[in-house]
């Protein structure tokens, strides 16, 4: 695929115009979707199996893992769906996870533990879980010489200057 490629460039948002030789962490992300049985929370909670309980149990297990994984590892998550009303036990809940580490092999190893935690959470809460891998990447391999040369050329031409209108538009987007 890259037989005829001499260099590959990428861009990442930052607060300055520069070319830098910074790497990234290896990363894998997925959306974990828990399904349960909905019921009225006061009228018949015994008939329900809360998908949100599955998400919360999973998150709790992931948080407990943090003490027992390499320090340079990172686990991030956000609940993206957790129910519609407090008086209804949710039959669907979703949580979006990132797992990062400097080495891709370690991400794979830790990811297996995360998947096992999701399965355990589902078993313990009487729910079902499935997940969809959203993305994964290895850490960037940087070229210090090329980055230094590119930064020198960027500074020679002055980088990007935004108009007043572009800055106002960015501020407007930032406010939403």
Feature annotation, model-predicted:
Residues 1-90:
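Histidine/acidic-residue-rich, glycine-tolerant segments that coordinate divalent metal ions
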Residues 52-176:
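Metal-dependent amide/peptide-bond hydrolase catalytic core
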